[in-house]
């Protein structure tokens, strides 16, 4: 048997290859790889072609699929290439890695960190190694640069330099650089220095030194940056020859970009030497920053990229290129389109310290506009790091825990991608961070730069957490560089630069370069030389691949589809494949391909195939097998290859063609298996007589044998296998069972090592294999270790017997006890057993009985009594019983004082008409008190109520008045509680408006500001911008009850500002903005016009606007239009026009003219000429078609897009159901796929649906369909008739009504005599009655378009003959019987009979005909079906006898032993192999038929037979049997006496206090007398206890239950006990009186109070839905049934809704209102005079400490900053202004609530000076504009501009701008005559600039 190649698994595959290792001599080197395969491959390591063996220094660790080579104490001789070779039956694979061993570095302190010592000559073989790498440098232009490197290796490598991937001679001429080889005395290895003479700006870049030898290639790189010196020396005129550089575009072009988008400018410059590039903006040099990137792309172009363009970025950008041969310019004008929807306040740049925070803030036009935050292109989501806040229109981003990577550009974006941009600068040790990500092509150089704050610091470079080699790193001063030359995929990852706790990270991404795979080998040939080998030869691919490659050889067994890898070959040539390389014998084909790092070539298949046979070797031979009697014996061996073999047993060959075999009938059974290389022989259930058998195995080249030895199996324990631990309670039955492997084998029981003795309390039984030890009623002393021991083996049982656990019946919940001193307190606990011990604990310490503590035990009740309590007796008590605890909390109140609450003086502040409640709590409920006010006893009245409730006394003032203020006392004996009540008028509140109001009005519009107060007589004051207003004609103040108004009859722009309506305790704010009149469209008046024009033609849209200078925008179909030759925009005075000189139909649409406030719409409709039908001079003639033919109607219109309407006979035509409508340009087509009569008529094509539109008509005529003969289908039909019978010929036509003629032998027939012609619709019939021989002939049915011929013959019927007779059959009962007989002719009529009766088809009878055969099948024959079967055909007949044999009635499922209890019903059941007749089986007992008994019944259900015994008795037990004629089965019925059982047990009952509980159970027997008990105490009938018994049912009813009645209720009868738990719950607590709304003044105490229905209950207080917990400011108190919540020192945060809850009851919510405390100014501000640059301090003292103040200067709010410091010291508020400026002078205001204080700040200005000068010379192009800009020492200073001494005035030519301290002069449309000297004078200071103009 040959295994197919699909069964060989998978060849080895390397998931991870070993990587080259470079170590220092004496260190440890380790190579690792991961290889998979099926079966798992064998891995060996080789070096120099020799397999390596493990030694002291060399080991091969392996962990699953991971294999390694570990080399300790590496020596130079260990260097070289190590090969990992993996091989299995499916193929082979290998991988190699080089190990380089270097000498340890010399301890030379002068060596640089990047230098490495040269390896010794004996160890230098291998790839080159850089000993010293080049260092990155930052130099000034003109300096000399030297880059050196030194590499080692044998043979000595060749060194060469590259710049930015290009050879040096391709970049420079030879005069600019020099290469200096190193000298031997400089050190070992090859050295090459690159010297650059007079470095230029283009010399900046990455320089890579390559080292290459025969063993490999290495490279090291460095960065060179050349900077412009601060002052460049003047150029030498001799070095300025004619320019040879030409720009790509000479004239500047225009570039538009939307705000927030990127703008990219690219300039491509050629020249030699390489030109220097400078970028300028508006005449000023540009330096790279966060938003301006300057770089050179891969194509050599110079790129300037402006990120996130803003309006300030617009202007002229110039790319200037120069070299020693000349210079050139290229310019572009950048325009930034601003969005219509803009941020009202954009973001501002911010700075922050590392680990600090940064806040970015902007404003959107509308608070409902959604925004999103970005860091460059990364969306920021709200988190702890990025906190995002939205307050109205303000959007704020707070960046927490700043780090270096947070430095960058941040954006806030709203809908429409409208953005505002800001820079976030993070100050820290790292000044210039890494970019977020860096994309580099594979093979290019990657450079990363970092600038640090301090020079000379050492940073750390790492990638994915691993430090990078030192040779890649360089640093100089503040700069740190990482240069990775020729990056590969392995270099990708997260690169981090760390400096202390600061770090910056970038994601380095390497984009792979696509490479072409190598070509395939050529000239592949196969030679079948030696026996069992094949020689394969080939040639290398052409052209040869540039990268290293190998050849992969694969094989395929003929007939299989799978190719399996054989070898991997490094060099071309030949390879010999021996037979040992294949897994099994067969014909094999081979193919080969080339594999490199860039892919795999196509396969080349060797022509032909070779027959290979593997040689088998014995890997693991047979071994003697020794087993126990009855076990399976397994013999196995492993071969080296897959091959068939033969097994022998005692010299007799065993056959392997069946899954299981036997040596001979009844002898040993065996099974032969082969899985891959393993062969197995399994002998099943060997017997003792098989001992000594000899097993042998034989195959080509291998023979082996082994012996079989059988031992008698020892006894062992089947269960339990491990030690068993069992736990029981006392009186419980204990059964320990041990099962042995042998039947009736003796065993001995031991307890705690002592042999046990049987008694009434300990019974030992043996039942077959099982041994049992029984303890009928376990006791505690029965606990111990039990052992069942037999012949050296034992089973152990750990038995623990313990008393049942103790349970606490009452109380089940925590009990709270409140008492006063000297009272007696009793704590009671009930357990479920009277003898159960308990322990009492107080505050964790066990209680001991004494005179002050009494412990009592009474039955199940346990009590702790405190006879005379003291305050120290309070605490937490516990009653511990077993594992359960009952908890009691005792609180003792000291009554040394009558008044419990309040303990001190109470101050109550209220407003008029408020409800005031004064509460005093006493220690005794019966004590009487006396209330006084200001020393006089009060008298109860409707205005003053006195209340008494338990221990609480209250004085209530329902509606307090001002005269109710005073001191109230609650007196009892010598004690009193004092309450000071202060009543004030309620503060004035502004009812409307509650929020700030913003009003926008236009000039001359009437503005009304209204404020509604809570009181009509409350005075108010109006303020505008902080100053109180005065009534005048332009400002009117009105008052109407509580409504106050401020009216501006004709508002002016200067009337805008902030208005305040101040009512003392409250204020309303109004922001008024008065704008210029809106820009409106005054003509035409309609806002939407429909205008009709002819096309082509002139279209002019005109409108008038006001004011005349209003700007408008034109839109078409929603898109803004731009002026062009085809669309002209005009503006003349107030008129605005849009003109289309040559309008086309596509110019139709919606045109909108829009001002800032209004818009008008013009719906332009361009009418086209009417549509006409073309190329039809005459009316189309009618079209006649046959049915089923296609019809195509077409016409051509004068315009392609014109719609048409098709109609048929006046009705519109719908596409579908065989109709298709097409439009092909101007052509319109209607297609009828298959014409029918319904398609005939008049078709009309009309252009459009309008009445009277042009139309074209077509007439279609469809001919009637011909009448065809449908049946019969054959053209000629033969019909046979018998003499005397009727002849009937029938024809069916395709349609009714067709004329048909009948002919016989050419003569026409008519309906007469015996011939009748009939027609019924499409059915035509010819009937000839009493056919005769003369009626035979040819009959023709002739229809108009079709005909049919009938060939009629009249013949006598043929004689029926029996070709074969029936044969007798004998079948078994239930089988089928089939009778078969052949008759002639085949269509003769036959009749079947059984026992003389005609047989008809049915479920059990089938009749069939197959040609001349007649078949009768009788299904499921029964004994009664036996008899004679007859077939009658005409006058002949044949008969056969059917015999049915009875089938043996055997039992498939036999009787089983049954155990039953007296009185139960028992069913005995058997299943027979077939359904027997009634009485086929009989039931017996003890071998005798069953007696007649009403309790016995028998039933049969198909195969199932049952015997029912109802209500078994002890006499029924015995042996029962079921018998048939062929089989018998017996079973034993055992009956045990009836036991008392619980049919329905007791159930737990839970009720409320005072209710009744009913317990009920049902027993298995009647008349049982039992006892009821609760908590172990027997119950007797009484008023609260009712006991009932009714047959099987027993019931207990308990009434009037209390909490103490909870416990265990049980019923006991004989040995039966059933119990359930009674749980009595307290009545739910309710809230009798809930809290009320409160209003307090800020800083006062607020008290909420509620009252419960019970004193012992826990209340939960909540604020705004959140639970409250006690704190120093929040107290929760319980006073009897009252619960108090006190809030001390209330603040605004305490305001809100409060509620209380107890259980499911809730009260509230109620509201707490905290009034703001009035603040007054105690110490006013003082005016300050200072000089510019000095500081000023303002102080103000207010009456309250916790007051927030606001500072303003000149009406502007002040916030802390660099020049503003604000602090608070108690009541004192301080403002410190530093570095004062002249514009800081103004009014200083401090405001704290309604209180404010004013002072003046006077600043003496210093003389105006120049701070920043314009350049001495400025060059501009003709036609552009020039901008000169200066900065003076302060804002607001006046400057004067002069040209050649003459003062310049603003105009079209000169524009003068001022922004803060910056002043600009803009010269428009510069001309040559504008060249000259310009001067700017500021005070006594001045500056000059020479303006140069270039160009024609």
From Swiss-Prot:
<protein>
    <recommendedName>
        <fullName>Obscurin-like protein 1</fullName>
    </recommendedName>
</protein>
<dbReference type="GO" id="GO:0007010">
    <property type="term" value="P:cytoskeleton organization"/>
</dbReference>
<dbReference type="GO" id="GO:0050775">
    <property type="term" value="P:positive regulation of dendrite morphogenesis"/>
</dbReference>
<dbReference type="GO" id="GO:0034067">
    <property type="term" value="P:protein localization to Golgi apparatus"/>
</dbReference>
<feature type="disulfide bond">
    <location>
        <begin position="362"/>
        <end position="412"/>
    </location>
</feature>
<dbReference type="GO" id="GO:0005813">
    <property type="term" value="C:centrosome"/>
</dbReference>
<feature type="domain" description="Ig-like 10">
    <location>
        <begin position="1174"/>
        <end position="1261"/>
    </location>
</feature>
<dbReference type="InterPro" id="IPR003599">
    <property type="entry name" value="Ig_sub"/>
</dbReference>
<dbReference type="GO" id="GO:0007088">
    <property type="term" value="P:regulation of mitotic nuclear division"/>
</dbReference>
<feature type="region of interest" description="Interaction with TTN">
    <location>
        <begin position="85"/>
        <end position="94"/>
    </location>
</feature>
<feature type="domain" description="Fibronectin type-III">
    <location>
        <begin position="517"/>
        <end position="615"/>
    </location>
</feature>
<feature type="disulfide bond">
    <location>
        <begin position="1381"/>
        <end position="1522"/>
    </location>
</feature>
<feature type="disulfide bond">
    <location>
        <begin position="1650"/>
        <end position="1700"/>
    </location>
</feature>
<feature type="domain" description="Ig-like 1">
    <location>
        <begin position="12"/>
        <end position="100"/>
    </location>
</feature>
<feature type="domain" description="Ig-like 5">
    <location>
        <begin position="714"/>
        <end position="800"/>
    </location>
</feature>
<feature type="domain" description="Ig-like 12">
    <location>
        <begin position="1357"/>
        <end position="1534"/>
    </location>
</feature>
<feature type="disulfide bond">
    <location>
        <begin position="149"/>
        <end position="209"/>
    </location>
</feature>
<keyword id="KW-0242">Dwarfism</keyword>
<dbReference type="InterPro" id="IPR013098">
    <property type="entry name" value="Ig_I-set"/>
</dbReference>
<dbReference type="Pfam" id="PF07679">
    <property type="entry name" value="I-set"/>
</dbReference>
<dbReference type="GO" id="GO:0005737">
    <property type="term" value="C:cytoplasm"/>
</dbReference>
<feature type="domain" description="Ig-like 7">
    <location>
        <begin position="902"/>
        <end position="982"/>
    </location>
</feature>
<dbReference type="GO" id="GO:0030018">
    <property type="term" value="C:Z disc"/>
</dbReference>
<dbReference type="GO" id="GO:0055003">
    <property type="term" value="P:cardiac myofibril assembly"/>
</dbReference>
<dbReference type="InterPro" id="IPR013783">
    <property type="entry name" value="Ig-like_fold"/>
</dbReference>
<dbReference type="GO" id="GO:0007030">
    <property type="term" value="P:Golgi organization"/>
</dbReference>
<keyword id="KW-1015">Disulfide bond</keyword>
<dbReference type="InterPro" id="IPR052385">
    <property type="entry name" value="Obscurin/Obscurin-like_Reg"/>
</dbReference>
<dbReference type="GO" id="GO:0005829">
    <property type="term" value="C:cytosol"/>
</dbReference>
<comment type="subunit">
    <text>Component of the 3M complex, composed of core components CUL7, CCDC8 and OBSL1. Interacts with CCDC8. Interacts with CUL7; the interaction is direct. Interacts with FBXW8. Interacts (via N-terminal Ig-like domain) with TTN/titin (via C-terminal Ig-like domain); the interaction is direct.</text>
</comment>
<keyword id="KW-0206">Cytoskeleton</keyword>
<dbReference type="InterPro" id="IPR007110">
    <property type="entry name" value="Ig-like_dom"/>
</dbReference>
<dbReference type="GO" id="GO:0005794">
    <property type="term" value="C:Golgi apparatus"/>
</dbReference>
<keyword id="KW-0597">Phosphoprotein</keyword>
<feature type="domain" description="Ig-like 11">
    <location>
        <begin position="1265"/>
        <end position="1357"/>
    </location>
</feature>
<dbReference type="GO" id="GO:0000226">
    <property type="term" value="P:microtubule cytoskeleton organization"/>
</dbReference>
<feature type="disulfide bond">
    <location>
        <begin position="920"/>
        <end position="970"/>
    </location>
</feature>
<feature type="domain" description="Ig-like 13">
    <location>
        <begin position="1628"/>
        <end position="1720"/>
    </location>
</feature>
<feature type="disulfide bond">
    <location>
        <begin position="33"/>
        <end position="84"/>
    </location>
</feature>
<dbReference type="GO" id="GO:0008093">
    <property type="term" value="F:cytoskeletal anchor activity"/>
</dbReference>
<feature type="domain" description="Ig-like 8">
    <location>
        <begin position="986"/>
        <end position="1075"/>
    </location>
</feature>
<feature type="region of interest" description="Interaction with TTN">
    <location>
        <begin position="17"/>
        <end position="19"/>
    </location>
</feature>
């Amino acid at each position: 048997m040959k295994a197919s190649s699909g069964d060989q698994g998978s060849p080895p595959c390397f998931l991870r290859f070993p990587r080259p290792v470079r170590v220092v001599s004496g260190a440890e080197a380790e190579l690792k790889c991961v290889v998979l395969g099926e079966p798992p491959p064998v891995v060996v390591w080789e070096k120099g072609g020799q397999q390596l063996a493990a030694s002291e220094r060399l080991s091969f660790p392996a962990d699953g699929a991971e294999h390694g080579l570990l080399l300790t104490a590496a020596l130079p001789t260990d260097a070289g290439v190590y090969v990992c070779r993996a091989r299995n039956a499916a193929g082979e694979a290998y991988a190699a890695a080089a190990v380089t061993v270097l000498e340890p570095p010399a301890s030379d302190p002068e060596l640089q960190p990047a230098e490495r010592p040269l390896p010794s000559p004996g160890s230098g073989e291998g790839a080159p190694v850089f000993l010293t790498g080049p260092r990155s440098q930052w130099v000034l232009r003109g300096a000399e640069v030297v880059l050196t490197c030194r590499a080692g290796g044998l043979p000595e490598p060749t060194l060469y330099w590259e710049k930015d991937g290009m050879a040096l001679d391709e970049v420079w001429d030879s005069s600019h650089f020099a290469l200096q080889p190193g000298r031997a005395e400089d050190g070992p290895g090859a050295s090459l220095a690159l010297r650059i003479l007079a470095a230029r700006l283009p010399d900046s870049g990455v320089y890579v030194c390559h080292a290459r030898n025969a063993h490999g290639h290495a490279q090291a790189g460095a960065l060179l940056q050349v900077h412009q010196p601060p002052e460049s020396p003047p150029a030498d005129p001799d070095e300025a020859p004619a320019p040879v550089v030409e720009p790509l575009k000479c004239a500047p072009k225009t570039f538009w970009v939307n705000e927030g988008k990127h703008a990219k400018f690219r300039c491509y410059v050629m020249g030699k030497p390489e030109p220097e590039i400078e970028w300028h903006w508006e005449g000023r040099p540009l330096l790279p920053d966060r938003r301006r990137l300057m770089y050179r792309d891969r194509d050599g172009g110079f790129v300037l990229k402006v990120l996130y363009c803003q309006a300030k970025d617009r202007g002229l950008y110039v790319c200037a290129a120069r070299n020693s041969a000349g210079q050139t310019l290229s310019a572009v004008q950048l325009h930034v389109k601003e969005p219509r929807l803009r941020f009202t306040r954009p973001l501002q740049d911010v700075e922050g310290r590392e680990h600090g925070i940064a806040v970015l803030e902007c404003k959107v036009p509308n608070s409902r506009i959604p925004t999103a935050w970005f860091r460059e292109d990364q969306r920021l989501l709200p988190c702890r790091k990025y906190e995002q806040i939205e307050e109205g229109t303000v959007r704020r981003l707070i960046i927490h825990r700043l780090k270096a990577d947070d430095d960058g550009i941040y954006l806030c974006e709203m809908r429409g991608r409208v953005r505002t941009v800001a820079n976030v600068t993070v100050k820290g040790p790292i000044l210039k961070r890494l970019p977020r990500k860096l994309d580099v092509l594979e093979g290019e150089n990657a450079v990363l730069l970092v600038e640090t704050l301090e020079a000379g610091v050492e940073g750390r470079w790492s990638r994915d957490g691993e430090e990078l080699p030192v040779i890649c790193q360089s640093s100089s001063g503040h700069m740190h560089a990482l240069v990775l030359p020729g990056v590969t995929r392995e270099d990708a990852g997260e690169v981090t630069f760390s400096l202390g706790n600061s770090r910056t990270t970038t994601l380095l991404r390497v984009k792979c370069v696509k490479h072409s795979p190598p070509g395939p080998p050529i000239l592949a040939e196969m030679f079948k030389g030696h026996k069992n080998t094949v020689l394969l030869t080939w040639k290398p691919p052409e052209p040869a691949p540039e990268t290293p490659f190998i050849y992969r050889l694969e094989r395929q067994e003929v007939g299989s589809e799978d190719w399996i890898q054989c070898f991997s070959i490094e060099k071309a040539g030949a390879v010999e494949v021996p037979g040992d390389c294949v897994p099994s014998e067969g014909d094999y084909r081979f193919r080969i391909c080339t594999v490199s790092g860039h892919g795999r070539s196509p396969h080349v298949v060797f022509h032909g195939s070779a027959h290979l046979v593997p040689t088998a070797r014995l890997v693991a031979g047979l071994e003697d097998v020794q087993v126990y009697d009855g076990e399976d014996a397994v013999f196995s061996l492993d071969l080296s290859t897959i091959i068939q073999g033969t097994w022998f047993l005692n010299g007799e060959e065993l056959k392997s063609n069946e899954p299981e075999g036997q040596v001979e009938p009844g002898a040993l059974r065996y099974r032969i298996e082969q899985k891959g290389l393993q062969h197995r022989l399994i002998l099943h259930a060997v017997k003792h007589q098989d001992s000594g058998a000899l097993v042998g195995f034989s195959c080509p080249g291998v023979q082996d044998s082994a012996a079989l030895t059988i031992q008698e199996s020892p006894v062992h324990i089947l269960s339990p296998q491990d030690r068993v631990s069992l736990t029981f309670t006392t009186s419980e039955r204990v059964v320990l069972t041990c099962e042995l492997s042998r039947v009736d084998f003796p065993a001995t029981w031991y307890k705690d090592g002592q042999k046990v003795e049987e008694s009434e309390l300990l019974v030992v039984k043996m039942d077959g294999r099982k041994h049992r030890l029984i303890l009928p009623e376990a006791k505690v002393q029965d606990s111990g270790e039990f052992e069942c021991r037999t012949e050296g083996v034992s089973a152990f049982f750990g038995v623990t017997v313990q008393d049942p656990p103790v349970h606490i019946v009452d109380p089940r919940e925590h009990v709270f006890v409140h008492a006063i001193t000297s009272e007696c307190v009793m704590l009671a606990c009930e357990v479920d057993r009277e003898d159960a011990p308990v322990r009492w604990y107080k505050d964790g310490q066990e209680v001991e009985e004494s005179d002050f503590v009494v412990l009592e035990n009474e039955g199940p009740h346990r009590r702790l009594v405190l006879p005379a309590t003291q305050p120290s007796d309070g605490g937490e008590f516990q009653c511990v019983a077993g594992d359960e605890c009952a908890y009691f909390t005792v609180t003792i109140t000291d009554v040394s004082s009558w008044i419990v609450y309040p303990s001190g003086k109470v101050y109550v502040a209220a407003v008029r008409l408020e409800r005031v409640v004064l509460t005093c709590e006493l220690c005794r409920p019966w004590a009487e008190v006396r209330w006084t006010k200001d020393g006089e006893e009060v008298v109860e009245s409707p205005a003053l109520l006195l209340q008494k409730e338990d221990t609480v006394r209250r004085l209530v003032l329902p509606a307090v008045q001002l005269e109710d203020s005073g001191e109230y006392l609650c007196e009892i004996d010598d004690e009193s509680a004092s309450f000071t009540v202060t009543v004030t008028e309620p503060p004035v509140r502004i009812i409307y408006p509650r929020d700030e109001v913003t009003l926008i009005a236009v000039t001359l519009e009437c503005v009304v500001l209204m404020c509604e107060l809570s009181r009509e007589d409350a005075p108010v004051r109006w303020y505008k911008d902080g100053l109180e207003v005065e009534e005048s004609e332009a400002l009117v103040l009105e008052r109407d009850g509580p409504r106050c108004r401020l009216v501006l009859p004709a508002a002016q722009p200067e009337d805008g500002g902030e208005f305040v309506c101040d009512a003392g305790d409250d204020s309303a704010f109004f922001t008024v903005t008065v704008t210029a009149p809106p820009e409106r469209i005054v003509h035409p008046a309609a806002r939407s016009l429909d205008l009709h024009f002819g096309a082509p033609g002139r279209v002019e849209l005109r409108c008038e606007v006001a004011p005349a200078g209003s700007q408008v925008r034109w839109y078409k179909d929603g898109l803004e239009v731009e002026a062009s030759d085809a669309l002209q925009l005009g503006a003349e005075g107030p008129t605005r026009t849009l003109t289309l000189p040559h309008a086309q139909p596509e110019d139709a649409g919606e045109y909108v003219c829009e001002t800032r406030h209004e818009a008008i719409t013009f719906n332009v409709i361009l009418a086209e000429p009417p549509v006409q039908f073309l190329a039809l001079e005459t009316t189309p003639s009618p079209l006649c078609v046959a049915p089923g033919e296609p019809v195509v109607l077409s016409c051509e219109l004068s315009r392609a897009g014109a719609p048409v309407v098709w109609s048929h006979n006046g009705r519109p035509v719908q596409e579908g159901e065989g109709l298709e409508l097409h439009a092909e340009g101007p052509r319109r087509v209607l297609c009828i796929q298959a014409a029918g009569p319904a398609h005939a008529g008049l078709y009309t094509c009309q252009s459009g649906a309008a009445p009277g539109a042009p139309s074209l008509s077509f007439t279609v005529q469809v001919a009637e369909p011909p009448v065809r003969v449908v049946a019969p289908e054959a053209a000629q039909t033969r019909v046979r008739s018998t003499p005397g019978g009727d002849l009937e010929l029938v024809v069916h036509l395709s349609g009714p009504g067709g004329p048909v003629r009948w002919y016989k032998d050419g003569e026409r027939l008519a309906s007469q005599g015996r011939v009748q012609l009939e027609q019924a619709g499409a059915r035509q019939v010819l009937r000839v009655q009493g056919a005769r021989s003369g009626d035979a002939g040819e009959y023709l049915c002739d229809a108009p378009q079709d005909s049919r011929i009938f060939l009629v013959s009249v013949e006598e019927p043929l004689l029926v003959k029996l070709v074969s007779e029936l044969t007798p059959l004998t079948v078994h009962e239930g089988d089928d019987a089939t009778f078969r007989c052949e008759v002639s002719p085949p269509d003769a009529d036959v009749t079947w009979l059984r026992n003389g009766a005609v047989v008809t088809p049915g479920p059990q009878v089938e009749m069939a005909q197959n040609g001349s055969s007649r078949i009768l099948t009788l299904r499921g024959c029964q004994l009664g079906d036996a008899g004679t079967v007859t077939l009658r055909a005409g006058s002949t007949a044949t008969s056969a006898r059917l015999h049915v044999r009875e089938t043996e009635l055997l039992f498939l499922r036999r009787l089983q032993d049954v155990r039953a209890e007296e009185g139960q019903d028992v069913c005995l059941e058997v299943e027979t192999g077939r359904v027997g007749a009634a009485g086929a089986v009989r039931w017996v007992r003890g071998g005798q038929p069953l007696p007649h008994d009403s309790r016995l019944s028998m039933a049969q259900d198909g195969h199932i037979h049952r015997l029912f015994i109802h209500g078994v008795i002890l006499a029924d037990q015995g042996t029962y049997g079921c018998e048939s004629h062929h089989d018998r089965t017996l079973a034993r019925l055992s009956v045990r006496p009836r036991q008392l059982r619980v049919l329905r047990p007791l159930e737990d009952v839970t009720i409320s206090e005072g209710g009744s509980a009913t317990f009920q159970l049902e027993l298995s027997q009647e008349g049982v007398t039992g006892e009821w008990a609760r908590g172990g105490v027997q119950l007797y009938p009484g008023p609260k206890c009712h006991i009932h018994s009714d047959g099987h049912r027993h019931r207990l009813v308990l009434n009037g239950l209390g909490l103490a009645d909870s416990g265990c209720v049980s019923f006991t009868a004989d040995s039966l006990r059933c119990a359930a738990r009674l749980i009595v719950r307290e009545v739910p607590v309710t809230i009798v009186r809930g809290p009320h709304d409160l209003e307090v003044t800020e800083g006062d105490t607020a008290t909420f109070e509620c009252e419960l229905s019970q004193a012992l209950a826990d209340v939960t207080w909540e604020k705004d839905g959140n639970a409250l917990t006690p704190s120093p400011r929040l107290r929760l108190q319980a006073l009897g049934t009252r619960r108090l919540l006190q809030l001390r020192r209330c603040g605004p945060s305490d305001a809100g809704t409060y509620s209380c809850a107890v259980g499911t009851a809730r009260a509230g919510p109620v509201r707490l209102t905290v009034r703001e405390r009035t603040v007054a100014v105690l110490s006013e501000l003082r005016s300050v005079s200072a000089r510019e640059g000095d500081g000023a301090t303002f102080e103000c003292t207010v009456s309250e400490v916790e007051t927030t103040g606001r500072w303003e200067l000149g009406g502007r709010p002040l916030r802390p900053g660099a020049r503003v410091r604000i602090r608070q010291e108690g009541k004192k508020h301080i403002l410190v202004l530093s570095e004062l400026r002249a514009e800081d002078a103004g009014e200083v205001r401090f405001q704290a609530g309604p209180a404010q204080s004013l002072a003046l700040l006077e600043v003496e200005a210093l003389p105006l000076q120049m701070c920043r000068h314009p350049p001495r010379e400025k060059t501009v192009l003709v036609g552009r504009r020039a901008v000169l800009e200066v900065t003076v020492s302060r804002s607001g200073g006046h400057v004067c501009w002069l040209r050649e001494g003459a003062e310049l005035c603003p105009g079209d030519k000169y524009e003068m701008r001022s922004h803060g301290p910056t002043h600009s002069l803009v010269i428009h449309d510069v001309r040559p005559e504008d060249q000259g000297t310009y001067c700017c004078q500021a005070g006594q200071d001045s500056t000059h600039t020479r303006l140069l103009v270039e160009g024609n």
